[in-house]
Amino acid sequence: MDRVQYEPTPMKSVSMRANNTRREFFSKSKGGPMVWRNLFFPTEILNALGVKMLTLETYAALFARNYKRTKKALDIAAYKGFAGETCSFLRVLEGTELPQPAFGVSTSQPCQQGERIFQDLARQYNFTDRFYSLHTPINADDPYSVDQIAEGLQEAVYLMEKALGMKMDPARLAEACELSNQAAELSKRCNELRWTSPPLIRGAEGVYSAVLFSQLWGRQELIDIQKQFHDELCRKKEWAEKHYRIEDTHRLLWLHLPPFYDTKVLDYIETVCNAPIVFEEVNFVDWDRLDPADPYRSLARKLLTVGYLDPKLRVHYILETAKKAQLNGCILYNHGFGRCSLSDSCFAKHLREELDNVGLPLLTLDGDCMDPTTDPCSTLTKISSFTESLNAKKFGNMFGRIKGA
Protein backbone atom coordinates (compact mmCIF):
# COMPACT_ATOMS: atom_id res chain seq x y z
CA MET A 1 0.00 0.00 0.00
CA ASP A 2 1.21 3.50 -0.79
CA ARG A 3 2.05 5.76 2.13
CA VAL A 4 -1.03 7.13 3.89
CA GLN A 5 -1.75 10.69 2.77
CA TYR A 6 -3.51 13.54 4.56
CA GLU A 7 -5.52 16.54 3.42
CA PRO A 8 -2.70 19.03 2.78
CA THR A 9 -4.11 22.40 3.90
CA PRO A 10 -1.99 23.82 6.78
CA MET A 11 -3.92 23.96 10.04
CA LYS A 12 -4.51 27.43 11.45
CA SER A 13 -5.18 25.87 14.87
CA VAL A 14 -1.51 24.84 15.07
CA SER A 15 -0.32 28.42 14.66
CA MET A 16 -2.99 29.62 17.10
CA ARG A 17 -1.66 27.19 19.72
CA ALA A 18 1.93 28.19 19.02
CA ASN A 19 1.15 31.90 19.32
CA ASN A 20 -0.69 31.33 22.60
CA THR A 21 2.21 29.27 23.94
CA ARG A 22 4.66 32.07 23.14
CA ARG A 23 2.43 34.61 24.86
CA GLU A 24 1.85 32.38 27.89
CA PHE A 25 5.46 31.41 28.53
CA PHE A 26 7.67 34.08 26.98
CA SER A 27 5.70 37.33 26.99
CA LYS A 28 7.46 40.24 28.69
CA SER A 29 4.16 41.84 29.68
CA LYS A 30 3.70 41.95 33.43
CA GLY A 31 0.15 40.63 33.78
CA GLY A 32 -0.76 39.45 37.27
CA PRO A 33 1.54 37.90 39.90
CA MET A 34 3.49 34.84 38.72
CA VAL A 35 2.20 31.51 40.06
CA TRP A 36 4.01 28.27 39.38
CA ARG A 37 1.87 25.15 38.89
CA ASN A 38 2.38 21.52 37.98
CA LEU A 39 0.46 19.87 35.16
CA PHE A 40 -2.56 18.93 37.23
CA PHE A 41 -3.49 21.88 39.45
CA PRO A 42 -6.72 23.28 37.91
CA THR A 43 -6.03 26.20 35.59
CA GLU A 44 -9.66 27.32 35.85
CA ILE A 45 -8.88 28.55 39.37
CA LEU A 46 -5.72 30.40 38.37
CA ASN A 47 -7.30 31.94 35.28
CA ALA A 48 -10.30 33.11 37.32
CA LEU A 49 -8.00 34.62 39.95
CA GLY A 50 -6.19 36.59 37.24
CA VAL A 51 -2.62 35.47 37.90
CA LYS A 52 0.09 34.79 35.35
CA MET A 53 0.85 31.08 35.55
CA LEU A 54 3.85 28.98 34.61
CA THR A 55 3.35 25.23 34.18
CA LEU A 56 6.79 23.95 35.11
CA GLU A 57 6.87 20.66 33.18
CA THR A 58 5.63 22.40 30.03
CA TYR A 59 8.22 25.14 30.45
CA ALA A 60 10.95 22.50 30.58
CA ALA A 61 9.60 20.73 27.48
CA LEU A 62 9.68 23.94 25.44
CA PHE A 63 13.48 23.92 25.54
CA ALA A 64 13.90 20.27 24.48
CA ARG A 65 14.78 21.08 20.87
CA ASN A 66 17.54 23.43 21.97
CA TYR A 67 20.06 20.70 22.70
CA LYS A 68 22.79 23.02 23.96
CA ARG A 69 20.42 24.65 26.43
CA THR A 70 19.02 21.32 27.60
CA LYS A 71 22.49 19.81 28.01
CA LYS A 72 23.64 22.82 30.00
CA ALA A 73 20.60 22.54 32.29
CA LEU A 74 21.18 18.81 32.80
CA ASP A 75 24.86 19.45 33.55
CA ILE A 76 24.00 22.11 36.14
CA ALA A 77 21.48 19.75 37.73
CA ALA A 78 24.13 17.01 37.86
CA TYR A 79 26.54 19.41 39.55
CA LYS A 80 23.83 20.11 42.13
CA GLY A 81 23.55 16.37 42.78
CA PHE A 82 20.65 15.29 40.57
CA ALA A 83 21.72 12.18 38.66
CA GLY A 84 19.99 10.17 35.96
CA GLU A 85 17.48 8.53 38.29
CA THR A 86 15.76 11.93 38.58
CA CYS A 87 13.26 12.72 35.81
CA SER A 88 14.88 14.76 33.03
CA PHE A 89 12.01 17.30 33.04
CA LEU A 90 12.77 17.97 36.69
CA ARG A 91 16.53 18.08 36.14
CA VAL A 92 16.04 20.68 33.40
CA LEU A 93 14.04 22.77 35.88
CA GLU A 94 16.78 22.39 38.50
CA GLY A 95 19.36 23.52 35.95
CA THR A 96 17.42 26.45 34.47
CA GLU A 97 16.96 29.98 35.74
CA LEU A 98 13.20 30.22 36.23
CA PRO A 99 11.00 33.33 36.49
CA GLN A 100 10.66 34.31 40.15
CA PRO A 101 7.21 33.27 41.42
CA ALA A 102 4.96 34.97 43.91
CA PHE A 103 3.31 31.66 44.77
CA GLY A 104 3.42 27.98 43.81
CA VAL A 105 0.77 25.25 43.66
CA SER A 106 1.15 21.56 42.98
CA THR A 107 -0.53 18.18 43.45
CA SER A 108 0.90 15.23 45.35
CA GLN A 109 -0.12 12.81 42.58
CA PRO A 110 0.63 11.44 40.08
CA CYS A 111 4.33 12.41 40.24
CA GLN A 112 5.70 12.29 43.78
CA GLN A 113 9.23 12.89 42.53
CA GLY A 114 8.03 16.08 40.88
CA GLU A 115 6.45 17.18 44.14
CA ARG A 116 9.79 16.80 45.95
CA ILE A 117 11.63 18.74 43.25
CA PHE A 118 9.05 21.54 43.33
CA GLN A 119 9.49 21.82 47.07
CA ASP A 120 13.25 21.99 46.56
CA LEU A 121 12.77 24.75 43.99
CA ALA A 122 10.52 26.61 46.43
CA ARG A 123 13.38 26.52 48.93
CA GLN A 124 15.89 27.73 46.32
CA TYR A 125 13.65 30.57 45.17
CA ASN A 126 12.77 31.47 48.76
CA PHE A 127 9.00 31.01 48.74
CA THR A 128 8.45 27.92 50.89
CA ASP A 129 5.88 29.90 52.88
CA ARG A 130 3.99 30.57 49.62
CA PHE A 131 3.91 27.05 48.23
CA TYR A 132 0.83 24.84 48.50
CA SER A 133 0.82 21.12 47.80
CA LEU A 134 -2.67 19.77 47.15
CA HIS A 135 -3.02 16.25 48.52
CA THR A 136 -4.66 14.23 45.76
CA PRO A 137 -6.00 10.73 46.45
CA ILE A 138 -5.88 8.49 43.38
CA ASN A 139 -9.09 6.52 43.88
CA ALA A 140 -11.97 8.19 42.07
CA ASP A 141 -14.42 5.77 43.73
CA ASP A 142 -13.56 6.88 47.26
CA PRO A 143 -16.61 8.86 48.48
CA TYR A 144 -14.40 11.16 50.56
CA SER A 145 -11.94 12.05 47.78
CA VAL A 146 -14.06 14.78 46.19
CA ASP A 147 -14.62 16.58 49.49
CA GLN A 148 -10.96 16.27 50.43
CA ILE A 149 -9.71 17.75 47.17
CA ALA A 150 -12.41 20.45 47.10
CA GLU A 151 -11.39 21.60 50.58
CA GLY A 152 -7.76 21.60 49.48
CA LEU A 153 -8.55 23.76 46.45
CA GLN A 154 -10.42 26.25 48.62
CA GLU A 155 -7.49 26.34 51.02
CA ALA A 156 -5.10 26.99 48.13
CA VAL A 157 -7.25 29.91 46.97
CA TYR A 158 -7.40 31.34 50.49
CA LEU A 159 -3.61 31.19 50.81
CA MET A 160 -3.08 32.78 47.40
CA GLU A 161 -5.53 35.55 48.23
CA LYS A 162 -3.66 36.23 51.46
CA ALA A 163 -0.17 36.09 49.92
CA LEU A 164 -0.95 37.97 46.70
CA GLY A 165 -3.38 40.56 48.05
CA MET A 166 -6.06 39.40 45.61
CA LYS A 167 -9.64 38.22 45.98
CA MET A 168 -11.31 35.44 44.04
CA ASP A 169 -14.45 36.68 42.32
CA PRO A 170 -17.01 33.82 42.46
CA ALA A 171 -18.58 35.12 39.25
CA ARG A 172 -15.26 34.86 37.42
CA LEU A 173 -14.72 31.33 38.71
CA ALA A 174 -18.20 30.34 37.55
CA GLU A 175 -17.44 31.89 34.15
CA ALA A 176 -14.13 29.99 33.95
CA CYS A 177 -16.00 26.74 34.62
CA GLU A 178 -18.48 27.48 31.86
CA LEU A 179 -15.70 28.37 29.40
CA SER A 180 -13.95 25.15 30.35
CA ASN A 181 -17.15 23.21 29.65
CA GLN A 182 -17.42 24.72 26.18
CA ALA A 183 -13.79 23.85 25.39
CA ALA A 184 -14.28 20.31 26.73
CA GLU A 185 -17.36 19.77 24.57
CA LEU A 186 -15.48 20.91 21.47
CA SER A 187 -12.55 18.67 22.39
CA LYS A 188 -14.86 15.67 22.73
CA ARG A 189 -16.32 16.40 19.29
CA CYS A 190 -12.82 16.62 17.83
CA ASN A 191 -11.94 13.29 19.40
CA GLU A 192 -15.11 11.63 18.10
CA LEU A 193 -14.23 12.80 14.58
CA ARG A 194 -10.79 11.25 14.84
CA TRP A 195 -12.10 8.00 16.36
CA THR A 196 -14.73 7.45 13.66
CA SER A 197 -12.77 8.45 10.55
CA PRO A 198 -9.78 7.31 8.52
CA PRO A 199 -6.56 9.00 9.73
CA LEU A 200 -7.20 12.77 9.67
CA ILE A 201 -3.93 14.20 11.00
CA ARG A 202 -0.58 12.72 11.85
CA GLY A 203 -0.06 11.68 15.45
CA ALA A 204 3.21 13.61 15.27
CA GLU A 205 1.05 16.74 14.99
CA GLY A 206 -1.65 15.75 17.45
CA VAL A 207 0.57 14.63 20.32
CA TYR A 208 2.26 18.00 20.70
CA SER A 209 -1.03 19.86 21.08
CA ALA A 210 -1.67 17.90 24.34
CA VAL A 211 -4.91 19.74 25.07
CA LEU A 212 -5.24 17.94 28.40
CA PHE A 213 -2.26 19.88 29.76
CA SER A 214 -3.14 23.30 28.33
CA GLN A 215 -2.98 26.38 30.56
CA LEU A 216 -6.00 27.76 28.71
CA TRP A 217 -8.78 25.77 30.40
CA GLY A 218 -11.20 28.38 31.67
CA ARG A 219 -10.42 30.93 28.94
CA GLN A 220 -11.98 31.88 25.63
CA GLU A 221 -8.73 31.25 23.74
CA LEU A 222 -9.02 27.47 24.14
CA ILE A 223 -12.57 27.53 22.82
CA ASP A 224 -11.38 29.45 19.75
CA ILE A 225 -8.52 27.02 19.14
CA GLN A 226 -10.67 23.91 19.51
CA LYS A 227 -13.43 25.38 17.34
CA GLN A 228 -10.88 26.05 14.61
CA PHE A 229 -9.43 22.55 15.06
CA HIS A 230 -12.90 21.00 14.80
CA ASP A 231 -13.61 22.85 11.56
CA GLU A 232 -10.29 21.66 10.16
CA LEU A 233 -11.00 18.06 11.13
CA CYS A 234 -14.39 18.22 9.38
CA ARG A 235 -12.66 19.34 6.19
CA LYS A 236 -10.00 16.65 6.55
CA LYS A 237 -12.64 13.99 7.20
CA GLU A 238 -14.42 14.84 3.97
CA TRP A 239 -11.12 14.50 2.07
CA ALA A 240 -9.98 11.33 3.86
CA GLU A 241 -13.22 9.43 3.29
CA LYS A 242 -12.81 9.91 -0.46
CA HIS A 243 -9.45 8.12 -0.29
CA TYR A 244 -9.63 5.56 2.54
CA ARG A 245 -11.92 3.40 4.58
CA ILE A 246 -11.30 3.02 8.31
CA GLU A 247 -10.23 -0.60 7.81
CA ASP A 248 -7.66 0.29 5.12
CA THR A 249 -4.92 1.38 7.55
CA HIS A 250 -3.44 0.57 10.91
CA ARG A 251 -4.91 2.56 13.78
CA LEU A 252 -2.51 3.15 16.66
CA LEU A 253 -2.92 4.88 20.01
CA TRP A 254 0.07 6.76 21.47
CA LEU A 255 0.22 6.58 25.26
CA HIS A 256 1.97 9.05 27.56
CA LEU A 257 4.26 11.80 26.27
CA PRO A 258 6.47 11.81 23.14
CA PRO A 259 10.16 12.67 22.78
CA PHE A 260 10.21 16.48 22.70
CA TYR A 261 13.67 16.92 21.16
CA ASP A 262 12.61 15.65 17.70
CA THR A 263 9.91 13.69 15.88
CA LYS A 264 12.19 10.92 14.57
CA VAL A 265 10.40 8.09 16.38
CA LEU A 266 6.93 9.31 15.42
CA ASP A 267 8.01 9.92 11.82
CA TYR A 268 9.44 6.42 11.59
CA ILE A 269 6.20 4.86 12.80
CA GLU A 270 3.92 6.85 10.53
CA THR A 271 6.06 7.52 7.47
CA VAL A 272 8.49 4.60 7.16
CA CYS A 273 6.29 1.90 8.70
CA ASN A 274 3.08 3.43 7.32
CA ALA A 275 1.24 2.92 10.61
CA PRO A 276 -0.91 5.98 11.42
CA ILE A 277 -1.25 7.14 15.01
CA VAL A 278 -4.93 8.07 14.99
CA PHE A 279 -5.12 9.31 18.59
CA GLU A 280 -2.99 10.32 21.57
CA GLU A 281 -3.73 9.90 25.27
CA VAL A 282 -2.75 13.51 26.02
CA ASN A 283 -5.78 14.70 24.04
CA PHE A 284 -8.33 12.52 25.85
CA VAL A 285 -11.18 14.54 27.40
CA ASP A 286 -14.08 12.77 29.09
CA TRP A 287 -14.75 14.30 32.51
CA ASP A 288 -18.18 15.43 33.65
CA ARG A 289 -19.34 18.98 33.00
CA LEU A 290 -18.25 21.43 35.66
CA ASP A 291 -21.01 22.96 37.76
CA PRO A 292 -20.44 26.75 37.87
CA ALA A 293 -22.54 26.86 41.06
CA ASP A 294 -20.30 24.28 42.76
CA PRO A 295 -16.87 24.94 41.23
CA TYR A 296 -14.53 23.42 43.79
CA ARG A 297 -16.28 20.06 43.98
CA SER A 298 -16.63 20.01 40.20
CA LEU A 299 -12.93 20.68 39.73
CA ALA A 300 -12.14 18.02 42.33
CA ARG A 301 -14.13 15.48 40.32
CA LYS A 302 -12.38 16.58 37.13
CA LEU A 303 -8.98 16.14 38.76
CA LEU A 304 -9.91 12.65 39.96
CA THR A 305 -11.28 11.54 36.59
CA VAL A 306 -8.89 13.23 34.18
CA GLY A 307 -7.31 9.83 33.63
CA TYR A 308 -3.79 10.05 35.01
CA LEU A 309 -4.27 9.83 38.78
CA ASP A 310 -6.05 6.48 39.03
CA PRO A 311 -4.24 3.70 37.05
CA LYS A 312 -7.36 1.51 36.99
CA LEU A 313 -9.45 4.35 35.55
CA ARG A 314 -6.71 5.19 33.07
CA VAL A 315 -6.65 1.62 31.75
CA HIS A 316 -10.45 1.70 31.50
CA TYR A 317 -10.28 4.86 29.37
CA ILE A 318 -7.68 3.26 27.09
CA LEU A 319 -9.86 0.18 26.57
CA GLU A 320 -12.91 2.33 25.86
CA THR A 321 -10.97 4.45 23.37
CA ALA A 322 -9.62 1.33 21.68
CA LYS A 323 -13.18 0.14 21.10
CA LYS A 324 -14.53 3.48 19.86
CA ALA A 325 -11.56 4.21 17.60
CA GLN A 326 -11.26 0.64 16.25
CA LEU A 327 -7.60 0.52 17.25
CA ASN A 328 -5.34 -2.38 16.33
CA GLY A 329 -2.31 -1.43 18.44
CA CYS A 330 -1.01 0.76 21.27
CA ILE A 331 2.41 2.29 21.87
CA LEU A 332 3.47 3.31 25.38
CA TYR A 333 6.47 5.64 25.53
CA ASN A 334 8.29 4.69 28.72
CA HIS A 335 9.80 8.02 29.71
CA GLY A 336 12.72 7.63 32.08
CA PHE A 337 13.09 3.88 31.45
CA GLY A 338 10.49 2.93 34.05
CA ARG A 339 11.25 5.66 36.59
CA CYS A 340 8.17 7.68 35.64
CA SER A 341 5.08 6.52 37.51
CA LEU A 342 2.92 7.25 34.46
CA SER A 343 4.68 4.61 32.36
CA ASP A 344 6.46 2.39 34.88
CA SER A 345 6.53 -1.41 35.00
CA CYS A 346 3.48 -1.65 37.28
CA PHE A 347 1.33 0.40 34.93
CA ALA A 348 2.71 -1.32 31.80
CA LYS A 349 2.00 -4.76 33.31
CA HIS A 350 -1.54 -3.78 34.28
CA LEU A 351 -2.22 -2.30 30.86
CA ARG A 352 -0.70 -5.22 28.95
CA GLU A 353 -2.80 -7.75 30.87
CA GLU A 354 -6.02 -5.87 30.13
CA LEU A 355 -5.13 -5.33 26.46
CA ASP A 356 -4.25 -9.03 26.11
CA ASN A 357 -7.78 -9.83 27.25
CA VAL A 358 -9.18 -7.99 24.21
CA GLY A 359 -6.46 -9.07 21.78
CA LEU A 360 -4.84 -5.65 21.39
CA PRO A 361 -1.02 -5.61 21.14
CA LEU A 362 1.08 -3.16 23.15
CA LEU A 363 4.57 -1.94 22.28
CA THR A 364 6.54 -0.36 25.11
CA LEU A 365 9.33 1.94 23.92
CA ASP A 366 11.97 2.85 26.49
CA GLY A 367 13.39 6.33 26.15
CA ASP A 368 13.52 9.84 27.54
CA CYS A 369 11.34 12.76 26.54
CA MET A 370 14.05 15.37 27.14
CA ASP A 371 17.47 13.72 26.81
CA PRO A 372 18.32 12.31 23.35
CA THR A 373 21.66 10.90 24.54
CA THR A 374 19.86 8.05 26.31
CA ASP A 375 17.81 6.95 23.29
CA PRO A 376 18.27 3.16 22.90
CA CYS A 377 19.67 2.02 19.56
CA SER A 378 17.03 -0.71 19.46
CA THR A 379 14.03 1.66 19.24
CA LEU A 380 13.55 1.60 15.47
CA THR A 381 14.13 -2.16 15.35
CA LYS A 382 11.41 -2.70 17.94
CA ILE A 383 9.02 -0.48 15.98
CA SER A 384 9.74 -2.36 12.75
CA SER A 385 9.13 -5.71 14.41
CA PHE A 386 5.89 -4.45 15.97
CA THR A 387 4.49 -3.04 12.73
CA GLU A 388 5.51 -6.16 10.79
CA SER A 389 3.48 -8.24 13.23
CA LEU A 390 0.55 -5.85 12.79
CA ASN A 391 0.89 -6.20 9.01
CA ALA A 392 0.90 -9.98 9.26
CA LYS A 393 -2.22 -9.98 11.39
CA LYS A 394 -4.15 -7.36 9.39
CA PHE A 395 -2.95 -7.92 5.83
CA GLY A 396 -1.61 -11.47 5.88
CA ASN A 397 2.01 -10.51 5.19
CA MET A 398 4.74 -8.56 6.99
CA PHE A 399 4.98 -5.81 4.35
CA GLY A 400 1.45 -4.38 4.51
CA ARG A 401 -1.48 -4.18 2.12
CA ILE A 402 -0.61 -5.26 -1.41
CA LYS A 403 -1.71 -2.92 -4.19
CA GLY A 404 -4.91 -4.09 -5.76
CA ALA A 405 -5.69 -6.44 -2.88
Regions found by a protein language model. Name each.
Residues M1-P33, A150, Q154, Y158-R289, ...:
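A charged, amphipathic alpha-helical module
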Residues F40, I45-T70, L253-L319, K323:
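Redox- and metal-dependent alpha/beta enzyme cores, enriched for Fe-S-associated oxidoreductases
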Residues I76-G95, V306-E320:
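Glycine-rich, highly charged phosphate/nucleotide-binding loops
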Residues S88-L159:
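Acidic/His-rich segments in extracytoplasmic proteins that coordinate ligands and/or metal ions
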Residues V315-G359, L363:
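C-terminal hydrophobic structural anchor segments
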